[in-house]
Amino acid sequence: MSFLVAIVGRANVGKSTLFNVLTNSHDALVFDFEGVTRDRQYGQAKYDDLDYLVVDTGGISDKDVGFDEFMAKQSQIAIDEANLVFFVVDGRSGLTTGDEYVASLLRQKDKKVVVVVNKVDGTDEEAAMAEFYSFGFDKVFAISAAHRRNTQKLVDKFLKKPLNEYYQDYTQTQEHKEQQRHGIHFSLIGRPNVGKSTLTNRMLGEDRVVVFDMPGTTIDSVSIPFERHGQKYTIVDTAGVRKRGKVKQTLEKFSVIKTLQAIQDSNVVVAVVDARQGISDQDLSLIHFAIKNGRALVLAVNKWDGMTEEDRIQVKQDLKRKLFFLQDYVDIHFISALYGTNVGHVFESIDTAYACANKKITTADATRLMQLAVEAHSPPMVGKFRIKLKYAHVGGHNPPVIVIHGNQVSRLPNSYKRYLENFFREALDFRGTPIVFEFKQSENPFADRKNKRSKDEGSKSKKVK
């Protein structure tokens, strides 16, 4: 589970600009389905090789007309779940009643808060910050997000220490969790009302009743261990598990943050799509996030029952067009969670994806496959020289990481990298899991000796003169 930074504040103070600086913007996940604000953004960021999540909560106000209940709930969740809060204010406008309202909400929380005074370019920083100390938060810092002024200092000063402390504790906790982990850890992800709760109950068994709502918690993800045909599993539920008869046709409780964290904590992710609504940009955002995090993936297209043959053909065509990037390596199952149709096949794909993601490959096998790939299709020329791949080894599992050493590997085109991925995938029969390739420049073990010899020869020539 990643460290979470929440960016909060009233509208138009520069929250999105700061979000873009922290996440490099292209990593943003924007969700606009019902129950989640259209401008809500979630992104991944990195500091010294440590990953963390960033959420831009959108403008918070007590006066917005039609301020949606779910919009407020998502902002509340973001603040409640955050390890660190960046409370952004406008240094040019000065302190406003809107800022006071946000500050009053944050004072009710036991959170680490940094008041980030934005838009201070062309102004006296100390003067701009002065009035914001009245909020009662002891950490106040001035930046210009648009010009990236002091943004790195902001991260160095306020994020570095808590982030490192979090991952020290998290690593120890995670090691304990791994020891206690019950079989294959998988999660069901998807938009609200696609049938995640119905599918969860179907997987757990008809008479299984799980209490979801925990005292004092807005939305909790619950890990539920169970066993099927001798195989142990743990399902991570983020929507709430209810007895079948008590599932109402209302909008599910939904937390994007919980969903992203569930993806990171899973071995396998089952993306649930509503066949009657089709696959949306939000579905694609969640799938891309899962792949980027190296999770094994299975796709379950729910509510397949009762559809006409014509509609089914249309759905399959849309899936093929929108999921082209999965390169046919992810199993797609057309199911009815309500009636249990094909749910057993989903379990089979979970087992297969998990096995492939954790498959043991020796250095000899990895190198042999690399050599076969090169023999079938050599790397391209770089100037007068051909890129040379020397040997390969496994660098990790879940996802499988193949490390290839060679010369000029930094110039290897993406097309050849895709070729290698497809070659390895076919040769190893990898289903359901992404494969990560890392390319490392081989070091010349005689380089230092050669340089030393050159220096010695140079000094000798000077003496001769």
Curated annotation (Swiss-Prot):
InterPro entries: G_ENGA (IPR031166), GTP-bd (IPR006073), GTPase_Der (IPR016484), KH_dom-like (IPR032859), KH_dom-like_a/b (IPR015946), P-loop_NTPase (IPR027417), Small_GTP-bd (IPR005225). Residues 446-465 are annotated as: Disordered. SUPFAM superfamilies: P-loop containing nucleoside triphosphate hydrolases (SSF52540). It comes from the Bacteria. Gene3D superfamilies: 3.30.300.20, P-loop containing nucleotide triphosphate hydrolases. GTP 1 binds at residues 9-16, 56-60, 118-121. GO terms for molecular function: GTP binding; ribosome binding. It comes from Francisella tularensis subsp. holarctica (strain LVS). This is GTPase Der. The keyword Nucleotide-binding applies. Associates with the 50S ribosomal subunit. Residues 3-166, 184-358 form the EngA-type G domain. NCBIfam families: GTPase_EngA (TIGR03594), small_GTP (TIGR00231). Keywords: GTP-binding, Nucleotide-binding, Repeat, Ribosome biogenesis. GTP 2 binds at residues 190-197, 237-241, 302-305. Residues 359-443 form the KH-like domain. Transmembrane segments: none annotated. GO terms for biological process: ribosome biogenesis. Belongs to the TRAFAC class TrmE-Era-EngA-EngB-Septin-like GTPase superfamily. EngA (Der) GTPase family. GTPase that plays an essential role in the late steps of ribosome biogenesis.
